[in-house]
Amino acid sequence: MRLLGALIGLAVGVLGAAIVLTAYRRWVQPWQHRWGATDEEVWAAMPGDELVPAAASTTRAITIAAAPEDVWPWLVQLGYGRAGWYSYDWIDNDGRASADHVVPELQDLQIGDQILMGPGMGPAVRAMEPNRYLVAGDREGGSWCLALNPAAGGTRLVSRWRVRWPLTPATVFWVLLSDPGAFVMERRMLKGIKARVEGAAVGSAA
């Protein structure tokens, strides 16, 4: 009887997990993957797309009440060991607070420079056009583009990740496990950039 009860419990657990996973993949994940982005932004080609063809992608965006040239300095200084990620610093910046101002000595970002995600790891800058876009990544793992598009009322900051994973049970499990966390961190980053840029604009106008 104990064995039967254990098997029934296991079956119920597996079924419950399958239902939750299916619901997440069908309704939650699509919303996460395009948070804040319009249909046009989701389907538009962006710099860096060619680095990783036939890849899974996310496109997220936010409107910032400032000109692209006022947003750009905050992008070129981001990264671990630099200005931080403007996100949850206790997770991605060793607890050090992300910069709340533009740091002049961090503005000279060049092609080939590494943007660290953590100690010793991170993609290299592959392309950039000041005040327009910044692309980092490689052909093996993935690419990341931050684009600044002028819009009514300011700038649309659009972030696109493209990743090609080998299709194995381990990678599928890892993607499903890390996907919600990546969304939470990136949304916080986009909101953090917006708050800093708009706060700086208010401060300079005062």
Report each predicted region and the residues it spans:
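Short, hydrophobic/aromatic-rich segments at coil-to-beta transitions
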Residues: 112, 127-136
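Glycine-centered loop/turn motifs
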Residues: 104-121, 126
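Membrane-penetrating hydrophobic segments
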Residues: 1-11
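Hydrophobic pocket/interface hotspot
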Residues: 71-74, 125, 157-159, 193
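Beta-strand/loop substructures that line and gate deep hydrophobic ligand-binding cavities in soluble
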Residues: 38-42, 138-195
